[in-house]
Structures are given as C-alpha cells and as structure tokens.
A protein has these predicted regions:
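Phosphate/pyrophosphate-binding active-site segments
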Residues: 2-12, 148, 184-186, 299-397, ...
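Active-site diphosphate/adenylate-binding microenvironment
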Residues: 18-22, 26-30, 36-49, 354-435, ...
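Glycine-rich phosphate/diphosphate-binding loops that line cofactor/substrate pockets in enzymes
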Residues: 19-30, 72-78, 102, 160-164, ...
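Thiamine diphosphate
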Residues: 42-117, 121-126, 265, 269, 271-283, 313-315, 321-323, 402-480, ...
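Glycine-rich, anion-gripping cofactor-binding loops and their flanking helix/strand elements
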Residues: 75, 221-303, 401, 410-442, ...
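Glycine-rich, acidic loop regions that bind phosphate or pyrophosphate groups
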Residues: 112-153, 175, 245-351
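Conformationally flexible catalytic loops at phosphate/diphosphate-handling active centers
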Residues: 128, 144, 156, 160-211, ...
Length: 558
C-alpha cells in the first residue's frame, strides 16, 4: 500500500500522510488528538506515537465525545482542537459537535478517514462522500485526495479554523493515500492575524457613546476567543460603562465588579439608550437585537462589534457597526471615547448597582433553601463558595444549567463552558475531558441535567482510564424540565417529558471505576461536594431535585 519515500531536501519533511498531518497540527499548537480507534486513520496514530515528542492520544467511547472534546479545547486554549474520526459512522457521529463549533465560533479541525480512492465506487466498507454532509456546518470541508496534498491542505485547515471568524474545518483522506508517503516544506507556526478596524467606524461608535446617557456593553464569547479580555476590561473600567457578559465572555468583568450588571440585565437592557454588543451575535439570547421600546418608549440604539465582517448582524436595525481584531477595536474605541465628551452617568450606574444588590439579596433565600425535595438553586448555594478563582465550570443541561447561568459568576475569563447558541446536549463529558487536560491543576466541575447525563455518561470510562479527575453534579428532577413546563403551559398536559424517577447515576459512575453518592437532604450537598473535590477521581454527586422548581423564563427561547 505504501510507496518508496521521496528523498527530502533541506527544510523538507518526508513520511506517510499521517506523519505529515501530525507535524502540521503540532506546528499549529495542537497537543492532543481526540479519537476513537478506527483502521481508516491508523496512520494518524502512527504519526502521533512516533512524533518527537509523541503527541498525546486521548481515546474515548463515542466519537461525539472526541469531537466535543476538540471543540472545547478550541474554546479553552484559543487554538484549534483536533479530532480524528474513522470513516462513515465515525464522521457522522461527530457532526453535532462540528455544528456546535460552527454556531459558537470554536476553532477545531476534524480529520476523517475515507474509503480507499483506488476502490472508490466499488462498495468499500463505510464508503461515503463525507464533505457534503459536513459542508453546511463548517468553514471548509474537503477531501485531500493524495498524500502530497496533506501538508498544504492541513495547514490551510488549521489556518482557516483559527482565523476570525473561528470555526470548524473538516478534511478527509482516502485510506490508501493515508499510508502513502510524500515530502514538502516543514510546517511553521502561523503568524497571528490582526485586522484593524475602519477609523471612521470607530469614530462613529465613539460619538454614539459620547451622546449616550445610559449605555450598556455586552461582552460575548468572541472577546475571549480573540484574546481581547484585557482590552475589554480596560474599556469598561476607563469608560465607566456598565457591562453584561455571556458565553465565554463571562468572567471578563469578574463577579462582584461594580460595573458588572448581569444580575440587573432586564433593567439594563430595557432602560438603556445605547447597547454596544461586542463579540456575540444578536440572536435569541439577546432579543434578536431589540432592546427597550416598551409602552411606547424609544428603543435603544444598537451598535454591533464583531471580529469579522460576516459576523455583523444583517437582521437588526443598527446605529453603527465595526469589525476587526477585537483588542485593536477596543483600544482604538477607548482612545476616541477619551477624547470626546464624558456625560455624568453616575445615576444610571447607581440604579443598576442597586438592582444588583437587591437581586443578590433576593437570591440568597433560594441559595439557602431547605425545601424537600431539594430546590436546584440550593446546589449552587453550596457549590459557588467552594469554587476557586481558576475553576472551570461546564454546563450540559436545560433547566438545571439555566440556574447555573444565574448564580455562577466566574472570577476569571475562560472558566465557563456551555453549548452556546446551538444548545446541544451531550457535550459535557467531552468538555470535561478537554478542561482537565487544558487546566491540569484547576477544579473542573461538570453540571449535568439528568436528561443530558444520558447522552454521554459512558465516557466516564474515558475519565477513569486516562486518570482525569472531574467533579460531576447531576440535578436529577426525573424529567426533561425545559420541555415539561412549557408543554403543560401550552396544552395543559405533557408527554414524553418524564424520565425514570431518581435514577442512580452515581452507580453508573461507580461501575465504570469512578465514585459518587446520592443526596436527598439539602444539608448534605456541601459535605458531598467536599468529598468529591477531595477524591482525586471522577466523582458524581447525584442530587434529587424538585421537578416543580422550574427555572423562570419569559420565553421558550426560540
């Protein structure tokens, strides 16, 4: 199946296609290959094992977990994650994670196996033309038809995945060509891309801010992804503008900061005369870009700032917009704002801070609730004080994770992962694996709804085999809570919304080699969490919660 390798020239790399692909991945900062064993991609494993030093191979129990781990690696490290999936069902099992990466702007490269080119059309095992399946949910999807295409094609893939606007890239290589050899220039680390904003656009936004009496800034995931968190905090503090954070923007303005008004979100967005949205789409999470305007009031003017032109909203009515490297954008904008008028906004900030304090006081009762069955908020009343500043908290669920979004305020950026706007359950175990590898000394906490737990809990086996301690907390209300309440409201009944009562998920983890316990008394949540953090093993705390204590929401989020 292999050919004699061509003779390398100085500065060239030679070897089979798997070796070449691994070399490119390493040049782009990849440290771990996430995979589930498949013969179509054996050369990738050989390339990883024989690299100097070897590349870490992290094998899982379901390809979705490998792809979700690569997606989360992209979020956490801000360099593309790598998943290697065998042909056919291996690739299709990873499609949901690829779609999540596309929606969230997560840099990742997925390398798929492919049936041999020299038998294509003859009915080889798992013969499937995969790029058309993935094309609609990726930045780029293509086949690298020969071993000689791998160096350049993989470099293009990683460059595209890691460039604004970030996202997933898929390539597959025919099995026969994966084993063939080629030579080409040795890969080098790419230079970072920094696109400056249009100075006229910067000036226009600065003028709007200077005219505003009640501005609000929203900081989203792309601020973190673009490594602009320091510039964003500098902008908020120097300009004195209240801020709301979402997605991986959480923690950029740390919890308890006087200008963080996420707990006064409704008042801030309904009362603002200017909303500057930076690094997040104007989607269902932000009212599709319409703020205020109730009872005949004038809606807020809206500014959208993005990392690339394709991310600027086309459906919302915008007063201004700009795009570019977000550090450059924010620093340029701050310089213009400082040169312009600075209205006294102390009353606006004071009102929002008062609401934050009142909300915090009101939440205290829920966080300490002694209700039986347990109110899910009580879990966060016990968990939040136990989180270190560098903790990574992962949400995989519906109602239970909605409570987390309300009560968990990261002390630092890069410490919160959720599925993002795609809303895909089952991402949690992959994200937990990625977080433990990316942050080996940090607390890693995976928050699971009991519905979400059913998607991926078998990959606790992966945590155990690879000695990756993670604390898992299940909010177990024996229902699909995000569907049960709305269906009852619409129809007066619900179907297909109940799960088996009080399922012993802790026993699943024990059977796979981890540890865990069930909690039915709110006073035992804290001690159970202490045991979990001290255990040094994958540990699941299964908290039986009240199905009627649903997260209050104004819309279905669609």
């Amino acid at each position: 199946m292999s050919e004699s390798p061509p003779s390398p020239t100085p500065g060239e790399l030679t070897g089979h296609a798997g070796k070449l692909a691994v070399a490119v991945a390493r040049a782009h900062g990849v440290e771990t290959m996430f995979t589930l064993s498949g013969a179509h991609v054996f050369p990738m494993y050989d390339g990883a094992v024989k690299a100097d030093p070897p590349m870490r191979l992290l094998d899982v129990r379901h390809e979705q977990t490998a792809a979700f781990a690569a997606e989360a690696t992209g979020k956490l490290t801000r360099t593309p994650g790598l998943a290697v999936l065998t042909a056919g069902p291996g690739v299709t099992n990873g499609v949901s994670a690829i779609a999540q990466a596309q929606f969230a702007g997560s840099p990742m490269v997925v390398v798929g196996g492919r049936a041999p080119q020299n038998r294509w059309g003859s009915g080889s095992l798992q013969e499937l033309d995969q790029p058309p399946i993935v094309a609609s949910v990726s930045k780029l999807a293509r086949t690298l038809p020969t071993a000689g295409d791998v160096l350049g094609g993989m470099d293009e893939a990683f460059t595209a995945a890691g460039s604004s606007h970030r996202g997933p890239v898929f390539v597959d290589v025919p099995m026969d060509e994966f084993f063939n050899t080629a030579a080409g220039p040795a890969p080098t680390a790419p230079a970072p891309e920094r696109v400056a904003p249009d100075p006229e656009a910067v000036g226009a936004v600065a003028r709007l801010i200077g005219e505003s009496a009640r501005p609000v800034v929203i900081l989203g995931t792309d601020v973190w992804a673009d490594r602009a968190e320091e510039a964003a905090l500098r902008f908020v503090e120097t300009a004195g503008i209240p801020a709301i954070t979402n997605g991986m923007g959480r923690g950029i303005v740390p919890g308890r900061h006087p200008l963080l008004v996420t707990k006064a979100r409704g008042q801030a967005l309904n009362g603002a005369d200017l909303v500057v949205v930076i690094g997040t789409p104007l989607d269902f999470r932000l009212g599709y870009g319409v703020f205020g305007g109730k009872d005949g009031a004038t809606p807020a003017r809206v500014v959208h700032v993005a990392d690339s032109p394709g991310q600027v909203s086309t459906h919302a009515s915008l007063a201004a917009s700009m795009h570019g490297d977000l550090t450059t954008v924010l620093d340029s904008l701050l310089a213009e704002v400082e040169r312009g008028p600075r209205p006294d906004r102390s009353g606006w900030v004071d009102d929002l801070q008062a609401t934050v304090r009142a909300t915090t006081e009101r939440d205290a009762a829920l966080l300490s609730a002694e209700a039986d069955p347990i109110h899910p908020a009580r879990i966060y009343g016990e968990l939040v004080p136990r989180l270190a500043d560098d903790a990574v908290v992962i949400g995989d669920g519906g109602d239970f994770v909605s409570f987390a979004g309300k009560f968990v305020e990261p002390a630092r950026p890069g410490g919160w992962l959720d599925p993002g706007p795609y809303g895909c359950l089952g991402a949690g175990l992959g994200a937990a694996i990625a977080a433990r590898l990316a942050r080996p000394s940090a607390q890693v906490v995976l928050l699971l709804g009991d519905g979400a737990a059913g998607f991926s809990l078998m990959d606790v086996d992966t945590l155990v085999r690879h000695r990756l301690p993670v604390v898992m907390v299940v909010g177990n209300n024996s229902a699909w809570g995000l569907e049960k309440g709305p269906m009852q409201m619409l129809y007066g009944y619900d179907v297909a919304a109940d799960l088996a009562p009080a399922t012993a998920y802790e026993d699943v983890v024990k059977a796979l080699g981890g540890a865990g316990e069930r909690v039915t008394d709110p006073r035992q949540i804290g001690p159970a969490l202490d045991r979990a953090f001290a255990s040094g093993v994958p540990y699941l705390v299964n908290v039986i919660t009240d199905v009627d204590a649903a997260y209050p929401r104004a819309t279905f989020g669609v």
